[in-house]
From Swiss-Prot:
This protein's name: Exocyst complex protein exo70
Function: Involved in the secretory pathway as part of the exocyst complex which tethers secretory vesicles to the sites of exocytosis. Also plays a role in the assembly of the exocyst.
Underlying gene: exo70
Organism, scientific name: Aspergillus fumigatus (strain ATCC MYA-4609 / CBS 101355 / FGSC A1100 / Af293) (Neosartorya fumigata)
GO cellular component term, pick one: exocyst
Main location: other
Keywords, alphabetical: Exocytosis, Protein transport, Transport
Xref: Pfam families: Exo70_C, Exo70_N
Length: 628
């Protein structure tokens, strides 16, 4: 038993010994590997220290090589502009007529770019080259400017605008192909000018040339219309108020607006941005100055003939204001210039309203002699014609009356001053008030003049009635006047004059009617018949004393003389048809019932012999009816 166990331990011990031996071999191998790693690391460090400087030198060489390439490129770029000068100089100095325009513009563009490149280097050595390029570009620019002027002059022959307006033809423009050329030329001139001194002199020389040539063409084309506007304003005093549309300012303005529209279409294609507005303003500077001058001269004529020609001021305001808004909506320009040109005319128009009132009063007060037959005076027709004409200018009058304020036209001080602001002005009502004030000023002034110059009440009454009749007729014949004066207040105010005129005329018959008044004694028998009863003239006459009978006879005789005189005077006076009928009816309404009563009571005073009682009731009624 012991022997087998010993053998088993011996085998295990041998195996352990083998394991230990293998472990020792592994340790030796590990040490060898560690030694190899140390040697490898040492070798790597040696290689690293050897290769590092080589790599660094390689990077430096690469950077140097890149810098050399860039220097070469810069040198090449510097040489290119110099080469461009030699290449383009011949084309540019020969002028655009020697080559195709596109080729010439391309050469200018290349020189322009070369100059930009040279200027960007900031090298002193390039200053001479830059100067040479500037000179070359200036030469080319001058030739392009000459070409631009030459092309524009081909389309600058003055035209007669009236021909195109009357035939409803479009105003002449520049052909589209030419506009394309002008666009390229102007762009090249503008670009080239940006390098030279021209900018400091006031901007784009192409714009100046365009404005000079086209501006002269426009001013010259409009000159005849300006002259016509001034010639057509001169009229005879007998021609009456200015008639709408008879002055040439309407055609002049229409032509100017057409020119602006046509020119803006051209400018919008040639120029860009802000230059469009500047080009339009510069081009029309001379034409608008002439237009403003014409308006000022028209204004002076209007001021000298305010009663008849203030309507021209209203027409000018209407025309120019409407045109300025249309032009502004189309171009965005020139509106302020038109409003400024209109200012003197507008101020005259504002003051004209108070002047019309004052002038009406002055003219009425200065009438030296009135027609002896009670006829009206030309001033009435003149004023009513003016008022009828006035209603045709409700547009411009709306703004003028609103700015003045209600009633402020009654004094010249208010016309030029600041009126109280009406927050909701009714321009139609304001115009109605002004027209009513004019009519009242006319009739009141003539009434005062009539009472001063006519001694007879009959003539005074007829004169005032004739004045009222002409005023009333003018209102009825004009739908616009009738509309403005159709309110109850206006009708009542005007009718006041008719009542006063009628009352004045009836005053002349008052003495005649007083002869038909008698004294009745109710205590006497038969002196006063019962109401509605039959009057017994014989009984009444019998009851009279001799003295009373004589008094009645005298009354009949006085009445006959006075009545005959007034009838003859009535027939001799001049009356408008309506006036004659109205006054005859008024006289009849007063006199006929008085005479009928008096005749009924006292016609038996002369027993039918006609010695005292000249008219019976029928014949008197016929006489009165014949007055109409």
């Amino acid at each position: 038993m012991v022997a087998p166990r010993h053998n088993a331990y011996a085998e295990e011990s041998a195996e352990v010994e083998v394991l230990y031996a293998n472990l020792e071999k592994l340790k030796l191998l590990t040490k060898k590997i560690q030694g190899s790693l140390v040697r490898l690391e040492t070798g790597g460090n040696v290689v690293k220290h050897a290769i590092g400087p080589i790599y660094s030198n390689t990077q430096s060489l690469q950077i140097t090589n890149s810098n050399i390439d860039k220097v070469n490129e810069a040198i090449e770029r510097l040489r290119q502009p110099l080469d461009a000068k030699n290449r383009e100089e011949g084309i540019i100095r020969a002028g655009p007529q020697s080559v195709e325009l596109s080729q010439y513009l391309a050469a200018m563009k290349r020189v322009d770019k070369a100059l930009v490149d040279l200027s960007s280097t900031n090298l002193k050595s390039n200053q001479k080259a830059i100067s040479e390029f500037n000179n070359l570009l200036s030469t080319g620019n001058a030739k392009l400017q000459d070409m631009l002027r030459g092309i524009l002059n081909q389309y600058a022959s003055p035209i007669e605008p009236l021909h195109y307006l009357t035939k409803d033809l479009p105003f002449p423009s520049i052909p589209q192909e030419t506009i394309s050329e002008l666009t390229s030329i102007c762009a090249a001139i503008d670009s080239a000018a940006s390098h030279g001194p021209q900018r400091g002199d006031g901007g784009n020389p192409a714009l100046k040339i365009y404005a000079d040539v086209r501006g002269a063409y426009l001013t010259s084309s409009l000159q005849n219309l300006a002259i016509a506007s001034l010639n057509t304003v001169k009229r005879r005093a007998a021609d009456g108020p200015y008639k709408q549309g008879t002055n040439g300012i309407g055609i002049y303005s229409n032509a100017l607006e057409n020119f602006i529209s046509t020119e803006y279409e051209i400018i919008a294609q040639i120029f860009t941005g802000d230059q469009r507005g500047l080009a339009l303003q510069t081009t029309f500077r001379s034409a608008l100055a002439e237009y403003s001058k014409t308006l000022r001269e028209l204004n002076e004529y209007i001021k000298a003939n305010l009663m008849t020609d203030c309507f021209l001021a209203f027409e000018i305001i209407e025309i120019v204001t409407a045109m300025s808004y249309r032009v502004d909506s189309r171009t965005g320009e020139l509106k302020s210039l038109f409003i400024e040109a209109l200012r003197p005319v507008r101020e005259t128009a504002k003051s004209s309203l108070s002047e019309l009132l004052e002038e009406t009063k002055r003219k009425a007060a200065s009438i030296p002699v009135l027609p002896p037959d009670g006829g009206s005076v030309p001033l009435v027709n003149e004023v009513m014609s003016s008022l009828t004409t006035l209603t045709g200018y409700s547009g411009p009058l709306a703004s003028i009356l609103t700015s003045l304020g209600d009633g402020n036209w009654r004094s010249t001080a208010n016309a030029s001053g600041t009126a109280p602001l009406d927050v909701s002005p009714d321009s139609s009502a304001l115009l109605s008030h002004f027209i009513l004030d004019m009519i009242e000023a006319l009739m009141s002034s003539l009434e005062a003049r009539g009472r001063a110059l006519h001694r007879s009440k009959a003539v005074q009454g007829v004169f005032l009635s004739n004045v009222f009749c002409i005023v009333d007729r003018a209102i009825r014949q004009s739908p616009e006047l009738a509309r403005h004066l159709g309110t109850p207040d206006s009708i009542a105010r005007i009718d006041t004059f008719r009542k006063r005129a009628t009352s004045t005329y009836l005053d002349a018959w008052k003495e005649t009617s007083q002869y038909l008044l008698d004294v009745q004694y109710t205590s006497r028998a038969g002196a006063r018949p019962a109401s509605g009863g039959i009057v017994d003239s014989s009984a009444i006459v019998k009851s009279l004393s001799s003295k009373d009978k004589d008094a009645i006879k005298d009354k009949f005789k006085a009445f006959n003389a006075s009545f005959d005189e007034l009838v003859n005077r009535h027939k001799a006076l001049y009356m408008e048809r309506e006036v004659r009928g109205v006054l005859a009816r008024e006289v009849q309404a007063v006199l006929e019932p008085l005479y009928a009563r008096f005749w009924d009571r006292y016609h038996e005073i002369d027993k039918g012999r006609g010695k005292y009682v000249k008219y019976d009731k029928g014949s008197l009624s016929a006489q009165l009816a014949a007055l109409a």
